[in-house]
């Protein structure tokens, strides 16, 4: 499958669906990859079935992409730039965007940094992230510290360690490298792109998702009923709401 270079880091991607279909970038969550997040959950099938051209990215540190052992390689602006580099590599001016969890945080950064490259964006499993302390705990657990008792850290460790493709040190660097101040009200208030925020109503990681949607002008909030952070992804309601939002373009 194809790779491309983004700032000296080799990244893996997948394309699916009709070549002339409206393109959409899919960006997965932390400790996941394109195949796990979007193929096994039948998102690729749903989107290509709706006539869309899917551009699936394995983020740096994940999947089949290169895995730097340096937190500075995982700044959110850098990872948002990777999505732009994919568009450049494919000679596309614009695309829709669908990101989940980490992929949604990357997408929000892209929405404020380079909105001209997107048509509309769906941000799933994202809330009001103020997680510097939690990120440190997750990194410690990924590095083998069994003294960490934080439930989220343990969840991510178990999820990551179960997959041989994962490099736990790269993932620790990734979670540490993404820590930065929240986007301020002025930057969120300047967003003009159509945005939808979608999250499971039982998702503790995406707490504050409705508030985030309220802070973005014109943004839509969709609650995925009865779902948590992990099982919201394959939910039919999530797919239906996303396809409806994309069809409004």
Language-model segments: residues:
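N-terminal cap/lid segment of alpha/beta-hydrolase-fold proteins
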Residues: 1-11
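Conserved HGGG/HGGXW glycine-rich cap/lid loop of the alpha/beta-hydrolase fold
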Residues: 9-66
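Active-site loop/oxyanion-hole signature of alpha/beta-hydrolase fold enzymes
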Residues: 39, 45-49, 56-96
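Conserved hydrolase catalytic core segment
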Residues: 93-131
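Active-site nucleophile elbow and catalytic-triad environment of alpha/beta-hydrolase enzymes
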Residues: 172-187, 202-204
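Short beta-strand/loop motif that positions the catalytic acidic residue
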Residues: 191, 197-199
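Catalytic histidine neighborhood in serine/cysteine hydrolases
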Residues: 213-230
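Catalytic histidine-centered segment of alpha/beta-hydrolase-like enzymes
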Residues: 227-239
């Amino acid at each position: 499958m194809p790779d491309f270079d983004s700032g000296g880091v080799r990244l893996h991607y997948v394309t699916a669906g009709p070549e002339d279909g409206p393109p959409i970038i899919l960006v997965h969550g932390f400790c996941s990859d394109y195949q796990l997040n979007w193929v096994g959950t039948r998102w690729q099938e749903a989107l290509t079935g709706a006539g869309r051209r899917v551009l699936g990215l394995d983020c740096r540190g994940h999947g089949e992409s290169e895995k730097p052992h340096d937190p500075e390689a995982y700044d959110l602006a850098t990872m948002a730039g990777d999505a732009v580099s994919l568009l450049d590599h494919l000679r596309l001016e614009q695309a829709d965007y669908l990101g989940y969890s980490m992929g949604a945080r990357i997408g929000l950064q892209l929405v404020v940094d380079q909105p001209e490259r997107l048509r509309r964006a769906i941000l799933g499993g994202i809330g009001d992230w103020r997680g510097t302390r939690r990120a440190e705990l997750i990194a410690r657990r990924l590095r083998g510290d069994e003294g960490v008792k934080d439930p989220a850290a343990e969840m991510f460790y178990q999820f990551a360690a179960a997959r041989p493709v994962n490099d736990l040190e790269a993932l620790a660097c990734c979670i540490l490298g993404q820590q930065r101040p929240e986007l301020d009200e002025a930057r969120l208030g300047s967003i003009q792109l159509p945005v939808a925020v979608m999250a499971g109503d039982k998702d503790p990681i995406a707490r504050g998702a409705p508030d985030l949607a309220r802070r973005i002008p014109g943004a839509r909030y969709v609650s995925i009923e009865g779902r948590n952070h992990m099982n919201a992804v394959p939910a039919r309601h999530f797919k239906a709401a996303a396809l409806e939002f994309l069809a409004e373009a």
